[in-house]
From Swiss-Prot:
The protein's Enzyme Commission number: 2.7.11.-, 2.7.4.-
Misc. comment: Both phosphorylation and phosphorolysis are carried out by the same active site and suggest a common mechanism for both reactions.
Cofactor(s) in the UniProt record: Mg(2+)
Gene name tied to this protein: hprK
Binding sites annotated in the UniProt record for ATP: 153-160
Protein name: HPr kinase/phosphorylase
Taxonomic lineage from the root: Bacteria, Bacillati, Bacillota, Bacilli, Bacillales
Annotated catalysed reactions: [HPr protein]-L-serine + ATP = [HPr protein]-O-phospho-L-serine + ADP + H(+); [HPr protein]-O-phospho-L-serine + phosphate + H(+) = [HPr protein]-L-serine + diphosphate
Highest rank taxon of the organism: Bacteria
Residue ranges, annotated region (Important for the catalytic mechanism of dephosphorylation): 264-269
SUPFAM superfamilies in the record: HprK N-terminal domain-like, PEP carboxykinase-like
Amino acid sequence: MAKVTANDLLERFQLELLSGEEGIHRSITTSDISRPGIEMAGFFTYYPAKRLQLLGRTELSFYKQLSPVDKEERMSKLCTYDTPGIIISRGLEVPPELLKASEKVGVPVLRSNITTTRLSSMLTNFLESQLAPTTAVHGVLVDIYGIGVLITGSSGVGKSETALDLVRRGHRLVADDSVEIRREHEDTLVGRSPELIQHLLEIRGLGIINVMTLFGAGAVRPFKRIALCVNLELWDQKKVYDRLGLSEDYLRIMNVDIPKLTIPVRPGRNLAVIIEVAAMNFRLKRLGINAAQQFSDRLNDVIEEGEQEF
């Protein structure tokens, strides 16, 4: 899980730092945003201090009606040593009591000109993306006809060579060798390349090549949602492979199941074309067109008709 601080928000959303510079590098550990409306009324029993606090027009309008003593009390309770930051939206004027309390405990106070609702949505999306669970998988990720295909298999089976052929056919490389995967939602996995090897492809006997330099910017993309896994394995004569496409297998990554196809590798098989067709067939299945199921249904109908004749 990546580390996110108020300083990252400062740079990302071009915020204005007003006070509490001492705590600008405090870690933000949750993507939940708190709008402390009930806290402005004095109820701090269940105050989520570890969340980012967002103050808008509603909270500050109520705050202005408080007595000077209550104002100081509310802001001193709002600013704790666990609070990662407080953001003021709409470019509103910041209460001096907040500036004083934030400096005392080192809580960064930031200000933005963006409306409260929109800012809350932007912050939540950014934090969910950055704080999402992360893992790394050995394989190649390619965007094929808009489908994120994760190509896996043992070392030397031909993953990178297949990816190179796919790039030559007009598809886009996301990552080679190591794929960093984030679970950004309950059922969404997004893969990207580590920065060190971004746009690079390693071909045995040839070495490392830069795909973007060779094929242009259209041959790469920074990230892609993973929708399908294609596992390459050396052909095993003793193993029975699926010939109809009715059986479904899945690869589980961080409790998310990804449809998985196993493609046996042997001389003479054009893996790039096979994976290309697999991606197109996957799209058809999502549209409700399943050729294997249609064939099975027709076959069953023929068998039933034959039984009725006898």
